[in-house]
């Protein structure tokens, strides 16, 4: 038991090192991730008995998996730099003023509704890398823009990306009975609806302060109820499309709301960014449709490809992958052998859509005369300079996650929590999902990692598994707010790389509190037989 306890404490070390360096020492994400990786390697070898070959393969898997994230960062920065170079952001700000002079509603429209829409169809950090620069272009401070997009995308991390994370969960557990499946959907969507409603109110507060919350409370509650109830109802019929459909309806509805007399009076942001001189001479000739053109093209290409199975399957048949042998530690933790590990389909990857949108945007702006001489050189230079440190951090984080997973550290950490807590485990069940997403930056990966574990705990405690499974994926969705790799995407595109610790410090307490509340609700459901 003492050895097991020592193993459990050892699993905490890489996570604690990462958090302390980010939050207390104010290290950048690349430095903190490298240190966390180093400690995970040492513990894998010394405590868990992983061989050099096994650990090396785990690092290689992490590096390969990180490529799918880096392939989102660079093209997203291309779009941002193209829009900045052309002066499109100045036009977007002016166009949003015509939509409504209420800047708080503008932020809600982009940072809550539009970001949620992007999560519904794309995911993989795209809502953050697209939404943050748009908000900055509208006058929001970079740090605030990152916080807003992290909040806005959270609720869509289970049924967004065409239900990918939900599919990951049900692939690991037994929800074959239709009644059990329906109960799981109701539990999950009810909690996600609350997450979304709270996020909307917080975004109103970040944009407009206490007055922003008070002035927009009715609008946020109505839209939140529409999204929450709509997602629940549609998910019972089609989990794949439920988030995308309600997000699309909400996107149309908020533009109708913006035309109401109530929102025709000017309202300023609570703490706006300072105005900066930009390419306003060129941008002033541009119309709002041209300014949004790269983003509109991104939406169209993503919808056409991802919602059309014939196109998606045709383009998705070309995949890149590596084969990896299975290994085991001295303690008996085994990894699977893969003939094709984590296949990357480049033509249906979010990065391909972003890159294509950036290229089309550049060509159009160049033809329209909005790109100055030397524009391409500046765009590529700025994009590469921002991508490199972000890529180092992402590689470090994903390699650390994979080393901990494959050498048994993550499993021991979760099992230790369940063994120690026993009957009060339901209180902590959302935190397991949160931990999985924090470690992997993906609710899909979290559900695959811990979905069956939650089911086994329910069996061990002889309790209903449905609330625990809902807690798993809802906790994972909340975890997307504090996921280091996702935060890195935001700080990179917002131009505040190195402030990842500050971002985490702003959202960590709220994420933990929300998980604690849901944990209490789930615990109460067992006590009172809900």
Residue ranges and their predicted role:
Residues 104-116, 141-155, 180-197, 393-396, ...:
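Alpha-helical transmembrane segments of multi-pass membrane proteins
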Residues 158-272, 474-530:
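Juxtamembrane and boundary regions of transmembrane helices in multi-pass small-molecule transporters
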Residues 2-13, 66-69, 122-127, 181-197, ...:
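Structural signature of hydrophobic alpha-helical transmembrane segments
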């Amino acid at each position: 038991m003492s050895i097991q306890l020592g193993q459990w404490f050892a699993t905490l070390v890489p996570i604690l090192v990462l958090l302390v360096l980010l939050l207390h020492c104010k290290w950048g994400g690349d430095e903190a991730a490298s240190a966390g990786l180093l400690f995970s390697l040492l513990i894998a070898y010394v405590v868990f008995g992983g061989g050099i070959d096994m650990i090396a393969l785990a690092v290689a898997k992490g590096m390969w998996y990180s490529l799918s994230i880096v392939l989102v960062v660079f093209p997203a920065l291309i779009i941002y730099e193209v829009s900045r170079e052309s002066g499109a952001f100045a036009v977007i700000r002016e166009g949003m003023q015509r939509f409504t002079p209420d800047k708080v509603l503008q932020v809600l429209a982009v940072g809550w509704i539009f970001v949620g829409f992007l999560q519904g169809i794309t995911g993989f950090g795209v809502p953050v890398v697209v939404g943050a620069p748009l908000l900055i272009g509208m006058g929001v401070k970079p740090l605030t823009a990152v916080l807003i997009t992290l909040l806005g995308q959270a609720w869509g991390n289970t049924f967004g990306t065409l239900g990918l994370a939900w599919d990951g969960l049900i692939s690991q557990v037994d929800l074959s009975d239709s009644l059990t499946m329906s109960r799981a959907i109701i539990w999950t969507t009810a909690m996600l609806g609350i997450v979304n409603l709270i996020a909307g109110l917080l975004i109103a507060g970040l944009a407009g302060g206490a007055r922003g919350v008070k002035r927009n409370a009715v609008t946020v509650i109505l839209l939140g109820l529409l999204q929450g109830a709509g997602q629940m109802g549609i998910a019972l019929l089609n989990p794949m499309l439920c988030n995308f459909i309600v997000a699309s309806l909400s996107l149309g509805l908020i533009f109708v709301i913006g035309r109401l007399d109530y929102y025709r009076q000017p309202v300023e942001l609570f703490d706006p960014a300072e105005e900066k001189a930009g390419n306003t001479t060129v941008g002033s000739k541009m119309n709002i449709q041209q300014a949004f053109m790269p983003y509109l093209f991104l939406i169209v290409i993503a919808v056409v490809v991802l919602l059309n199975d014939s196109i998606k399957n045709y383009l998705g048949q070309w995949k890149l992958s590596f084969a990896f042998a299975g290994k085991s530690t001295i303690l008996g933790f085994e990894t699977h052998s893969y003939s094709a590990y984590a296949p990357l389909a480049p033509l249906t990857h979010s990065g391909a859509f972003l890159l294509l949108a950036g290229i089309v945007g550049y060509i159009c702006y160049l033809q329209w005369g909005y790109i100055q001489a030397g524009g391409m050189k500046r765009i590529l230079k700025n994009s590469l300079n921002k991508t490199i440190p972000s890529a180092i951090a992402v590689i470090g984080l994903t390699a650390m996650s994979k080393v901990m997973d494959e050498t048994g550290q993550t499993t021991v950490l979760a099992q230790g929590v369940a063994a120690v807590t026993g009957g009060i485990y339901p209180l902590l069940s959302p935190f397991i999902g949160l931990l999985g997403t924090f470690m992997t930056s993906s609710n899909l990966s979290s559900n695959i990692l811990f979905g069956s574990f939650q089911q086994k705990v329910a069996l061990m405690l002889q309790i209903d598994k449905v609330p625990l499974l809902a807690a798993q994926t809802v906790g994972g969705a909340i975890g997307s707010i504090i996921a280091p790799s996702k935060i890195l995407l935001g700080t990179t595109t917002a131009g505040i790389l190195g402030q990842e610790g500050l971002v985490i410090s702003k959202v960590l307490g709220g994420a933990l509190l929300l998980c604690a509340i849901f944990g209490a609700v789930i615990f109460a459901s067992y006590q009172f037989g809900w």
